[in-house]
Design a protein with these regions (language model features):
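Active-site nucleophile/metal-coordination loop of metallo-enzymes that catalyze phosphate/sulfate
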Residues: 1-158, 163-167
Length: 169
């Protein structure tokens, strides 16, 4: 109490738009907080950058996207997506994946397989089904005779794929 009363202080917000996330409903994490504090200013980070690139069309106009689509179509191969599967909006958002799938279909990709990393950190630990079930319904609507899309594999994000807990890197 004495420190707060007798010395200058400033409260910092470490979530939402204060640290460059899309909305104030996004809880943030230490990474985005450190980036904002270290930079001394707020700048778009992670999922917000991806959202912006989808909204302004830069993602789909990029050489990488164009080459990926061209390669899959020319070789009659499968397009694969691997990534964090949640709406935590720190590292990713399911809407990013949906936008890429819709665009892949529009551009004539015929076969897509999705490899999901269940979150449990930026969202609730046991929340996987609340994301998988509606996403399966979305895939069913998107699927057609000319577009075969489905979840091919899945797993968790902890230890091996994203987080370093008890890992000796």
């Amino acid at each position: 109490d004495r420190l707060m009363r007798d010395y200058p202080m400033l409260r910092l917000r470490a979530h939402g738009t204060a640290v460059g996330l899309p909305s104030d409903d996004d809880m943030g994490n230490s990474e985005v907080g450190h980036n904002a504090l270290g930079a001394g200013q707020v700048f778009s980070q992670g999922a917000k950058l991806v959202s912006e690139s989808i909204e302004n069309g830069k993602m789909f106009a990029s050489d990488t996207w164009k080459a990926l689509v061209a390669n899959v179509k020319e070789n009659h191969s499968t397009m694969h997506f691997l990534g964090l599967f949640s709406d935590g909006n720190v590292h990713s958002h399911i809407d990013h994946l949906k936008a890429m799938l819709i665009r892949a279909k529009q551009e004539g990709v015929c076969r897509v397989r999705i490899h999901i990393l269940l979150d449990g950190r930026d969202v609730g630990e046991t929340s996987a089904l609340q994301y998988v079930e509606p996403f399966e319904a979305f895939l069913s609507e998107l699927r057609g005779s000319d577009f075969d899309v489905r979840i091919a594999s899945g797993g968790g994000r902890m230890t091996v794929t994203m987080d370093r807990y008890e890992a000796n890197w």
